[in-house]
Each structure stands twice: as structure tokens, then as C-alpha cells.
């Protein structure tokens, strides 16, 4: 945990090795951004969608391999139905507008979480975007939709129990690799950096297993104000840290 990032100019990286392969962002602060401007919450979400576009572009330019965005948690269903509808409508609109741009820019789209609970037309749009971008390699963009880390671990536990019951897995052979092979993120590189905006300092049920040895960065910037310079500053901070993975 560090102090909020300064708004100073960012120096170029010395080497691509300083760039994290896998960055995840808890995009927080849309509502507060809107409230501060006496605007409806949907205005903050729309501005947040613009920040997503800017950040995806910046991540690709910086050489980040995977960008995972906490777009809609399994707990977000508790929000007012009108706000949930607005969020789903915004996601639907963005997918329709950006799907082919994403494909042309070499971005591969993936989704983690039980997104089949979303409206069926939205599920179809997501599946279409996943399919047409599957062979892209410039950047993998992962949306966490109807995602909760505790639900993910329950899902993994059930899968392991089923395999053991069917004789496909000896309980004595269950290890870290067994669990990781069944996570939603099993085909992604290890998580290097988690960024949370808006000043809140918690993970909110996001990638709890994957974040075991990730660097955590909490910044005061509200998500709608997040941009390429903010991401560069976060990567600069990551590059200054020494990752020990429990060692000395």
C-alpha cells in the first residue's frame, strides 16, 4: 500500500521488463464523480466507460499483456434495479459500438464470472465479441462480470469434489496447481498488479486467490478521471517495488 500517486509527469520506462504482464483494476468512484458534479449516477458510469477505452488503449501501447477489469460484481445485483438496468444498457451499447474496433486493434476479449445470468441478448453479444477476437494477441482484455472471488472458489471446490467422487482425482494429490487449473483465470498469466481507484483500500471479493502475491496499489483518483498518465504512474510504482514472494 502506498500514498496516493502524484500528478507529476511520468518518465519513460527503462525496459519492457518493468511492465507488469497482468494488471487488474477495481474501477471505483463513478457514483462519487457524478455526485460531486450534481449529475445522475449514470453520467458517472458513462464517463467511466470512456476511461475504460482510454485505459485499454494505453495498456496495449505500454505492452501490458492482460488487463482485467472488475466491471460488475456478483454483489452489484443488490443495487437499485434502475441502476443495474442502466449499467447493462451501457455495456450493451459499448459492445455494439466497440466490438469491431477491438477486433481491428488486435485485442482479445475474455469474460470471467457467471455472465450467463445477464440478459440473453447481452450474453449473445459477449459471446460474439469473444468469438471474433479469439485469435488476437496484442492485448487480452478480461471483463469480470457477475464475478465474485468467493463464488469462484466455491465453484472450484465443487469441481474438485466431483473429480474425486468420480475417481478422476486422488485427494492426496490436490495441490495449488490443481486449484489454479480450475480457476476462471487458468489460461492467463499470474496477476502482477491490482489497482483500486477512489481511495478505498480493500479488494471487495476480487481475484482473492490470484492476488496472493500481486502488488496492491490504492489511489485516490476516481475511475472516470483515470487515464493513460495514471496507468503509467501506476506501472512506474510497480517497477520500483521488489517482489519477494514470501522470501527475503
UniProtKB/Swiss-Prot annotation:
Q: Name one GO cellular component term.
A: cytosol
- What cofactor does this protein call for? Mg(2+)
Tell me the Gene Ontology biological-process terms attached to this UniProt entry: polyprenol biosynthetic process
Q: Name one GO molecular function term.
A: magnesium ion binding
How does this polypeptide assemble, per the annotation? Homodimer.
Upper lineage is: Bacteria, Pseudomonadati, Pseudomonadota, Alphaproteobacteria, Sphingomonadales
User: What residues make up the catalytic site?
Assistant: 28, 76 (proton acceptor)
Where is substrate bound in this sequence?
29-33, 41, 45, 73-75, 77, 79, 196, 202-204
What is the official name of this protein in its record? Answer: Isoprenyl transferase
Q: Where does Mg(2+) bind?
A: 28, 215
Entry superkingdom: Bacteria
* Keyword field: Magnesium, Metal-binding, Transferase
Q: What is its EC number?
A: 2.5.1.-
Physiological role = Catalyzes the condensation of isopentenyl diphosphate (IPP) with allylic pyrophosphates generating different type of terpenoids.
Which family, according to the similarity comment?
A: Belongs to the UPP synthase family.
The note on the cofactor says: Binds 2 magnesium ions per subunit.
Q: Which Pfam families match?
A: Prenyltransf (PF01255)
